[in-house]
């Protein structure tokens, strides 16, 4: 324990001692070892972070957009220079394979920051003539202090997705990382400071989600909450934000996304996409296509192709460069996923491969769950209806296009969806009827910085990434100007 580093809060450009006197540990899910101890924020610390953010935001907003853009671009450069170091830390904290964190997590987060750094100078109002002597113009002004609440599956990427548009628009952000995977958010704060961000513009307060989340969502100074996490928690955050000061919210919540394989699909391509849509990041992706609909006439061939590919997955030490499937991010989450797998068996689904915990050799020390594929599934099963957030694929047979569209939409979620077909007209016809915010045709999973992402129904409110998101970190002020005489009416 003496060798374990203790991490403080990051407020006003430096590490500061938390006042709560409480700490919690970050656990390496590959072996159960403690990798860091973190101090937990108190309500007093939240107040300090808010005051700091208010001070820093005034300085930041007073800078020109070009100055803000240059600082954010410097942060991008530092992120890319330190990519491998950050990826190793992310792997230690999350259990995700280094082959993934080194090529995706930091890379895509930096891409989003670069995108919004470029848009900082494009924030502008408009001027509209009303008559010869009068016109009005608009200004897009920053909201002020905003808060981001992150999830545990993509810690640094989520921190960047939330902070990039907020900072580009001239706001300050207080960020609360998941207590399960808090380490890289602190590194990001260091990088922002190194790049020249004024003190207080990006503060990190870690600790128990329920307490800190409530303090942030109810704080009268904070103007917006951007939250990523589960549906039930999201509802509470949204209600609290509305009940306090009518804060604007962005909610990126859960999913149970359908992947529809059409009868004309190339089965090799379809199987590749299905495996990617279920087992990337050990299945811990909110957009996973966990309900895989396949024509009954092609079920046997598709199932065979999927099993062949799952057998090629390399489970192991996430730091090993050839590993492409690591442990789940925590031991409690592993138990939750295993309970879903058992319920699938009990409800009559057939295990084609996997179906339990990986216990061979050193894997027994970690939170490893075997990539699992179920067939003979029905729409009423828990594994088909509920978000598992783990490496569990459910294959469902169907007969007609109308049937599969109805079944795909028969869910409270609406985050993502996909179609695999060689008929592009059919692809668009199906996708246009699917109730989901992020859709893919003949591919799965890519979320470029330019593309807005978010859900329908209970999968979320608002969008992240893309041009539309930037506007939600500003407010519009309208100003009418009269150049002529003013005629009173009283």
UniProtKB/Swiss-Prot annotation:
Which CDD domains does the record cross-reference, listed alphabetically? Answer: ALDH_F9_TMBADH
Q: What's an example Gene Ontology biological process for this entry?
A: glycine betaine biosynthetic process from choline
Active site location: 162, 252, 286, 464
Any idea of its EC number?
1.2.1.8
What is the UniProt remark on how the cofactor binds and its stoichiometry?
Binds 2 potassium ions per subunit.
Q: Return the annotated site residues (Seems to be a necessary countercharge to the potassium cations).
A: 248
Write out the pathway annotation from the protein's UniProt entry. Amine and polyamine biosynthesis; betaine biosynthesis via choline pathway; betaine from betaine aldehyde: step 1/1
Enzyme class, top EC level, equals oxidoreductase
Q: What does this protein do?
A: Involved in the biosynthesis of the osmoprotectant glycine betaine. Catalyzes the irreversible oxidation of betaine aldehyde to the corresponding acid.
PANTHER family for the chain: ALDEHYDE DEHYDROGENASE-RELATED
- Put simply, this protein is called Betaine aldehyde dehydrogenase
């Amino acid at each position: 324990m003496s060798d374990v580093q203790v991490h403080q809060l990051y407020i006003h450009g430096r590490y500061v001692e938390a006042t709560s006197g409480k700490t919690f540990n970050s656990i390496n899910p590959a072996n159960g070892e403690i990798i860091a101890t973190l101090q937990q924020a108190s309500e007093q610390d939240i107040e300090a972070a808010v005051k700091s953010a208010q001070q820093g935001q005034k300085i930041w907003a007073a800078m020109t957009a070009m100055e803000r853009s240059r600082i954010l671009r410097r942060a991008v450069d530092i992120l890319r220079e330190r990519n491998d170091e950050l990826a190793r830390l992310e792997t230690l904290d999350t259990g995700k394979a280094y082959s993934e964190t080194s090529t995706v997590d930091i890379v895509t987060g930096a891409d989003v920051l670069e995108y919004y750094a470029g848009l900082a100078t494009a924030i502008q109002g408009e001027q509209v003539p009303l008559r010869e002597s009068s016109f009005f113009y608009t200004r897009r002004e920053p909201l002020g202090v905003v808060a981001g609440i992150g999830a545990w599956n993509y810690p640094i990427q989520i921190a960047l997705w939330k902070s990039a548009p907020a900072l580009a628009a001239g706001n300050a952000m207080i960020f609360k990382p998941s207590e399960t995977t808090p380490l890289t958010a602190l590194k990001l704060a260091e990088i922002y400071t190194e790049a020249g961000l004024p003190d207080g513009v990006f503060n990190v307060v870690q600790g128990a989600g329920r307490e800190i989340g409530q303090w942030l969502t109810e704080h009268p100074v904070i103007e917006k909450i951007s939250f990523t996490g589960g549906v039930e928690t999201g509802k509470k955050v949204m209600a609290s934000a509305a009940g306090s000061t009518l804060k604007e919210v962005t909610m990126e919540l859960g999913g149970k996304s359908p992947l529809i394989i059409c009868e004309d699909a190339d089965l090799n391509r379809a199987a590749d996409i299905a495996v990617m849509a279920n087992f990337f990041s050990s299945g811990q992706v909110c957009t996973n296509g966990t309900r895989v609909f396949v024509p009954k006439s092609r079920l046997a061939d598709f199932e065979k192709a999927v099993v062949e590919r799952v057998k090629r997955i390399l489970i192991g030490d996430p730091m090993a460069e050839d590993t492409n499937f690591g442990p789940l991010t925590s031991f409690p989450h592993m138990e939750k996923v295993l309970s879903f797998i058992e319920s699938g068996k009990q409800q009559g689904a057939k295990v084609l491969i996997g179906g339990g915990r990986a216990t061979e050799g050193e894997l027994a020390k970690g939170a490893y769950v075997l990539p699992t594929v179920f067939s003979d599934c029905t729409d009423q099963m828990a594994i088909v209806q509920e978000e598992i957030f783990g490496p569990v694929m459910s294959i469902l047979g169907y007969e007609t296009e109308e049937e599969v569209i109805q079944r795909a939409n028969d869910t409270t979620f609406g985050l993502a969806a996909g179609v695999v077909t060689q008929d592009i007209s059919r692809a668009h016809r199906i996708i246009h009827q699917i109730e989901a915010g992020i859709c893919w045709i003949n591919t799965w999973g890519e979320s470029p910085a330019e593309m807005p992402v978010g859900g329908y129904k209970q999968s979320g409110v608002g969008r992240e990434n893309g041009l539309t998101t930037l506007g939600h970190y500003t407010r519009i002020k309208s100003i009418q100007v009269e150049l002529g005489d003013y005629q009173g009416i009283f």
